[in-house]
Amino acid sequence: MVWTALDFETTGTVKGWPNEPWQLGLVKIEDGVVLPETKWETLLHVGDRPFSPRAVGRYAELREELAAAPAITDVWPEIVQRLCGTPLIAHNCATERTMLTKLAPMTVFGPWIDTLAYARGRYPGLPSYALGDLVESFGLKDEVERMCPGRTWHDALYDACACALLASRFMSEGVA
């Protein structure tokens, strides 16, 4: 079975402005194995607008690239092709689910696997269920860094790969 792990980075909520995605990253998992050759990402043009001070990520470094990035409508056919027809995996999938529903309210995506909810249920009592902390706890950080050299947390591709590796770990236990 093929799964798709994804992550959006968004502008965050700013009064008078919608929360918009500015980066999408994804990677496929087949039969429990993460397929690095399927990594895909895009920056998304959001126009000249403020970002929430609470929005984390590399957007400040990428202002020029974001200004030249395609609008989501330009890459939407490719996004749909990459996401439809596979179960979707995200860490705290509410953000990804909300973004996709907002962008295409008549399109059904999923089913969804939430690695955050899964980890909370399977491993009660951990000090933190943040993606980075879980990746560290399960000894996956080096593998994430090999897949996404020069990247770090709150980069959509890095986070999607981290989520995929975490999901793969859960699948290898025979419990996901």
Language-model features and meaning:
Residues Y129:
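S-adenosyl-L-methionine-dependent methyltransferase catalytic core, i.e., the SAM/SAH-binding region
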Residues T107, Y123-L126, F170-A176:
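Short helix-capping/linker segments at secondary-structure and domain boundaries
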Residues V135, L157, C161-A176:
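Acidic two-metal-ion nuclease catalytic site recognized across multiple nuclease folds
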Residues M1-G110, G125, D133-L140, C148-G150:
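Conserved non-catalytic scaffold segment of RNase H-like nuclease domains
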Residues F8-T10, R97, T115, A156, ...:
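Generic detector of well-ordered alpha-helical packing
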Residues C148-Y158:
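A short glycine-threonine-serine/GTX helix/turn-capping micro-motif
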Residues V108-R120:
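Conserved beta-strand -> loop -> alpha-helix junction used to position metal-binding or nucleic-acid-contacting
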